[in-house]
Curated annotation (Swiss-Prot):
GO MF term set: rRNA binding; structural constituent of ribosome
Keyword Transit peptide in annotation: no
Source organism, top-level taxon: Eukaryota
PROSITE patterns, per the entry: RIBOSOMAL_S4, S4
Job description of the protein: One of the primary rRNA binding proteins, it binds directly to 16S rRNA where it nucleates assembly of the body of the 30S subunit. With S5 and S12 plays an important role in translational accuracy.
The species this protein was found in: Glycine max
Name of one Pfam family that matches: S4
Protein's name according to its UniProt entry: Small ribosomal subunit protein uS4c
Similarity remark: Belongs to the universal ribosomal protein uS4 family.
Segments for region (Disordered): 15-44
Self-association and partners: Part of the 30S ribosomal subunit. Contacts protein S5. The interaction surface between S4 and S5 is involved in control of translational fidelity.
Length: 201
């Protein structure tokens, strides 16, 4: 299954706020409608929608998300928490959380077009797994800096999570540590996502 490129508002109207996909927010009316429907949903539907929220927020294909679930399942600790850490430490998400891109698709575009450096080296793989002490910078070219400056100026001013530090005038971000799950940028019940996949096998 390919990455979603359809109408974004349609998705947030059904699944709720997906800040990684779009900065738009669902209307109060659609949120109330979703709440009234939630009591009528089957357990399968509830798990499916949590999985879809995760997939669309981080901009993943079905195959990519399944791969992350399998990696998380083999790691020590809670599978759901490890899954969220893996997704949050992707380079495209780090760029988004730093405010150097307004959405994850925008971050992915910057990375694909080679505007982003990690520890002084160009990285053009959005799924690159960042680690503590990594330094994320704009390429030392005017076009790269202008693009990122525009995003820094236009991105909504969210409180920066504790695991990140931003130096906007240097076009630089620092990863201080692995993310604490309370700072995950999406309201999600990750256990339902793990349950969804465990019941598919």
């Amino acid at each position: 299954m390919s990455r979603y490129r359809g109408p974004r508002f349609k998705k947030i109207r059904r699944l709720g706020s997906l800040p990684g996909l779009t900065s738009k927010r669902p209307t109060v009316k659609s949120e109330l409608r979703n709440q009234s429907r939630s009591s009528k949903k089957s357990q399968y539907r509830i798990r499916l929608e949590e999985k879809q929220k995760l997939r669309f927020h981080y901009g993943l294909t079905e195959r990519q998300l399944l791969k992350y679930v399998r990696i998380a399942g083999k790691a020590k600790g809670s599978t759901g928490q490890v899954l969220l850490q893996l997704l949050e430490m992707r380079l495209d998400n780090i760029l988004f959380r730093l405010g150097m891109a307004a959405t994850i698709p925008q971050a992915r575009q910057l990375i694909n077009h080679r505007h982003v450096l990690v520890n002084g080296h160009i990285v053009d793989i959005p799924s690159y797994r960042c680690k503590p002490q990594d330094i994320i910078t704009a390429k030392d070219e005017q076009k790269s800096k202008t693009l990122i400056q525009n995003y820094l100026d236009s991105a909504p001013r969210e409180k920066l999570p504790n695991h990140l530090t931003l130096h906007p005038f240097q076009y630089k971000g620092l990863i201080n540590q692995i993310i604490d799950n309370k700072w995950v940028g999406l309201k999600i019940n990750e256990l339902l996502v793990v349950e969804y996949y465990s019941r598919q096998t």
